């Protein structure tokens, strides 16, 4: 198998998704955070590709190089990624999602159990009240005219601990000690996934161990090795 490096658009679920593909080997899908793009996870993309994986770094609907939308829902984004997986004939791919991307990964596996071979999330939440730092929630709600992307953060996702118990994939649930996601919420997610583990990183915030950092990639590669992916 040869090393690939290209960008393209996938037509899925009624939208066009820009993505970058890099590497060769077992597939790993990378999903960025709210308002970001595949470039947000450039360091991790390179790191995983160099370690022998085929990375698909996707721009989520209405973000990055994609046409902006008037409204956004995590379930639609999860459906997009599910259809991307089907279209590319990927069998039980691994997914790493940062923030919104992590929500999408969990939502996908809740909607379609058994689709993913492994899940890693950084700074994800499965519901809003009691999951995020209060000051962050207060700031969200102070905005009298929230953007469509921000509006989604205010009211979604709406998953439950019971939903997490249906997730079949081995899962690595990560957040920073000083994350906007409360540590107890990160633990709630990981402890309810049957094959889940939790890592709270000392001294890190919501993005410090991900953006231009090898830390998250090292954790993911170690996780893949342990589960034989």
Report each predicted region and the residues it spans.
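Short beta-strand/loop motif that positions the catalytic acidic residue
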Residues: 167, 173-175
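Active-site loop/oxyanion-hole signature of alpha/beta-hydrolase fold enzymes
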Residues: 60-93
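Catalytic active-site module of serine/aspartate enzymes centered on a nucleophile-bearing elbow/loop
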Residues: 203-229
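Conserved alpha/beta-hydrolase "acid-adjacent" motif
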Residues: 180-185
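Gly/Ala-rich beta-loop-alpha elbow adjacent to hydrolase catalytic centers
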Residues: 97, 101, 105
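Conserved HGGG/HGGXW glycine-rich cap/lid loop of the alpha/beta-hydrolase fold
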Residues: 18-64
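Active-site nucleophile elbow and catalytic-triad environment of alpha/beta-hydrolase enzymes
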Residues: 148-163
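Flexible "cap/lid" loop of the alpha/beta hydrolase fold
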Residues: 107-111, 119-147
